[in-house]
Amino acid sequence: HSLGEAATAPMAIPFGEVSLPGYFIPAEGGKNEVRPLIIFTNGYDGTIVDTYFACAVAASRRGYHSLLFDGPGQGAMLYERGTALRPDWEVVIKAVVDFAEGLPLVDTRRIALSGWSLGGYLAPRAASGEPRISALIADPGLWSIADGFRDFVVRNLGVSPDAAADLGKLDEAVMRK
């Protein structure tokens, strides 16, 4: 199969006063059939293009339609429109699911949400507040956000190694809540 077989359709997903850039990728062999949908949400520094190659092509080859988007603070929304990342991802996903339900090829009883990288942290929160999500895939890439940021903050932000060592307390505090 070539990557070109999965035709993409650009979408503008309404979100408040703006629209989120997105793409609908139909399932291979089922581009005109109602099928389950996987909504893919990327990470902090990810883009729709990354998600297409890392996730949507494989989903399409396995019979799933895919909906990719850049949310606030991600990809084009960050780099071209200057929007900030927001923690209440359930608000973002509600708008994306509202949009997906209007697509004629989507089996609205079988909508999954997949989060990758930082999206792997945002997706569970979003799914917990969105009853129309029937399945969740969380792939955060890190067991601990603090572990991933220690070297970064020392190297790029001038934080002392001793102070960076305390970042683990952040994970502990979050887990106690």
Predicted regions and their residues:
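Aromatic pocket-lining residues of Rossmann-like dinucleotide-binding sites
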Residues: 59, 126-127
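N-terminal cap/lid segment of alpha/beta-hydrolase-fold proteins
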Residues: 1-36
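Residue in the alpha/beta-hydrolase core beta-strand immediately N-terminal to the catalytic nucleophile
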Residues: 70, 110-112, 135-137
